Amino acid sequence: MTKNIQVLFVCLGNICRSPMAEAVFRNEVEKAGLEARFDTIDSCGTGAWHVGNRPDPRTLEVLKKNGIHTKHLARKLSTSDFKNFDYIFAMDSSNLRNINRVKPQGSRAKVMLFGEYASPGVSKIVDDPYYGGSDGFGDCYIQLVDFSQNFLKSIA
């Protein structure tokens, strides 16, 4: 029997990109009928500025517009995440460096850019939309759907 998969999405503050990735991925898993393959789908940030907060209203707006809801509250990456998750997906190169900097030796988690699952022509880096307008959040959504679908195909 195949072991169930645990996936963690990581950005800087855990209020924009990674909670959107978590919600989008969960939605894509449900649409594909693959819920039984996953034990945990979660997200966190490398920083602790927003711990306990709901996602950015613009993240929630994009999710709602696409029929996706989340109850996520921001949290910070912890050492235990490296033993509890199979995949730790970073949204950008800076996040990836920060994750690898604190990754314990012997960690079982595969740490990588989620964008490694990008379709040709789609940027592998999910830019932080926090300081921009609503368009950036829509762009993130499009990327995250693409990455999610491609990752799910890769494990089928």
UniProtKB/Swiss-Prot annotation:
SUPFAM superfamilies according to UniProt: Phosphotyrosine protein phosphatases I
Location in the cell: Cytoplasm
Active-site residues from the entry: C11 (nucleophile), R17, D128 (proton donor)
Keywords (A to Z) from UniProt: Cytoplasm, Hydrolase, Protein phosphatase
Chief location category: cytoplasm
A GO CC term attached to the entry: nucleus
Single GO term (MF): acid phosphatase activity
Enzyme superclass (EC): hydrolase
SMART domains (alphabetical): LMWPc (SM00226)
Coiled-coil parts of chain: none
Enzymatic reactions: O-phospho-L-tyrosyl-[protein] + H2O = L-tyrosyl-[protein] + phosphate; a phosphate monoester + H2O = an alcohol + phosphate
EC numbers: 3.1.3.48, 3.1.3.2
GO biological process assignments: signaling
Source superkingdom: Eukaryota
Family matches, as PANTHER family: LOW MOLECULAR WEIGHT PHOSPHOTYROSINE PROTEIN PHOSPHATASE, LOW MOLECULAR WEIGHT PROTEIN TYROSINE PHOSPHATASE
Function: May contribute to dephosphorylation of 'Tyr-15' of cdc2.
Record family assignment: Belongs to the low molecular weight phosphotyrosine protein phosphatase family.
Annotated protein name in UniProt: Low molecular weight phosphotyrosine protein phosphatase
Gene: stp1
